[in-house]
Amino acid sequence: MRYTLQHPEQINSLILIASSSVRVEGEKEAESDEDECSPLAWRLLSSNFTRKILLVFTPKFLAEQGLKTSIYDQDLATKEWANEFHELVLLEGSREAIISMFSGDRYGNETPEIFKQISAPTLVIHGEEDNLIDVESSKHFEENIPEVAVKIYSNIGHLPMYEDPERTAKDIRDFIDTIR
């Protein structure tokens, strides 16, 4: 998102999936560190010390727990799928990217009006049952990006591209077809 705002001339279109917007005073923060229901990994990421450890050592059980928290349909939270997620986390650069999202204040002092600067056609996809990023954050995109389509999927959590890949792919294809 930051790149889009800093380099609008390089962006032809934008697709945001389960994306956070900005912090708004009084709004529920789904990914709260203090939330007892949040996965252990999220709580560990709130500490500089444990972030450094997680850069080199990421236990598989954290991927399992994170997966269970991320999806709505718990039947999808299989060991095989958790293993795949763990393998993705171990890819070069993945841990650094994940940890950077939890380092410092991702939101800054920006207000939702900053999204009015986005001129590229934008598709926003969000699961209504997302436990990590409040689905209400998508309303900031809808209210402020001039050319935006927002798709909210019912009975879907934080990972619509895994929980309903066919629908997600169709919506992305349809979006791309409209901007050609």
Locations of regions flagged by a protein language model:
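Conserved alpha/beta-hydrolase catalytic His-Asp/Glu region
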Residues: 26, 51-117
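Flexible "cap/lid" loop of the alpha/beta hydrolase fold
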Residues: 5, 12-52
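Conserved hydrophobic packing residues within short motifs/helices of P-loop NTPase cores
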Residues: 15, 123-125, 151
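Glycine-rich nucleophile elbow surrounding the catalytic serine of serine-hydrolase chemistry
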Residues: 1-2
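Conserved alpha/beta-hydrolase "acid-adjacent" motif
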Residues: 131-137
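Catalytic active-site module of serine/aspartate enzymes centered on a nucleophile-bearing elbow/loop
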Residues: 146-180
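Active-site acidic short loop of glycosyltransferases
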Residues: 8-11, 119-120, 147
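Short beta-strand/loop motif that positions the catalytic acidic residue
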Residues: 118, 124-126, 130
